[in-house]
Amino acid sequence: MTFIHRLPLHIVSSILDQLDTITELGIAIRSHRIFYNSFKHNAQTICRNILSSQIPPNLFPYANALLESNVVDPSNHDSVKDLLRRLESRIKNDPKSLERFPVNAYAALSRALAAIEILRENLVSEALPLFMSSFEADHASGASQQEVFRLNRAFMRYQIMCNLFCVPYDVGSRLVDEDITRYFFHPFSPWVNEQILCVYRYLERKVAEAYDDVAAHDVDWGKVPVEWAYDANVCPMIQWNLGRGLPVLLSIIRAANFEERRQLLPMHPPRAYNMSNLPFQTLVHMLPENSLIKALNPNFSQRILDECTEANFQRLCQPLDGVQDDISSTPYLLWRAVHSKESVFWVAVDWELHKNHWDCACFVWDLEKPQRSAVVQERSNELSDIEPFFPRLQSSWEHDDKLRSENER
């Protein structure tokens, strides 16, 4: 009998506890019977211990919600509302442990967390230099702990959103739009919600890049109608891919060549979707009908944000935001500057106007040196007026070439 066979199962379990991800656990239990036997007797404990080391600090409430979103029925509206209420309660109480879920839900969470770590670092490497140059801001070369938290939270909320709301027809009807606003978005301030748009935009342009490459150059895709005039936020195939989950999106982004991209991007979704159920149209609901008029309570509805009082802006803060995103934070100051000239009645999720702001993730970073609000507003306005930081492939084509590509399909 070999040494490893003489080890007690609780010792073997403690070895498995040290693995970094559930994927590594799967490899281990297939490699030796003693690991399999130990896992079979202690599956819940081993999975929770691995995940407890993998979950970033202060994000256990979101991890539990993400676990639950993997198993809840999105068409059961009461269950979805209860899940989101529990998320609020968990954030307030900040538990440091995971609740009991099926092993496949633990595996899904572990894959999402592993994807988030890589996606976050890639986003920082691209967006932070853009922010520093656009706002002439002093900043360290990497993200601070506070900024990493914001990005982790935004990615996790994005995945929860996809699990609960970006669902195909055959799953049933999702939560109605007003309840998505009320239960998913409204417990957070507008600037914390707009942090999700920063990670969304990063994912959107990466998927659009892969989609454009495959749709333009793959022979089989010649059978598929493609309208190159569609922006990524309204292109059904790009939007469908964006709802497939962070691990799939990471695979698309990391695809090293055309053939890998082609394998990852099917010509047709395997299940039918309503466009309003896809990511961008869901994110539009982060602002309620009539926008922020109730909270800011101006003297008349057409007043612009810049004319509202500080006391009323305080009402937009939410307890779930955390101190790093309160009314003294840079994300708040930048959000107010970006939207300063918009009517209180119509502060909107405006893809055309704000995609450059999202590309530099301006609602994520902290300014190391304070800047006057007028200066920040001026630089923000310039971002709205310049060409996109990341133009689509077809932007370099002549109009006749686009028409020819569409008509020959």
Language model: regions and residue ranges:
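Charge-dense, extended regions
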Residues: 195-409
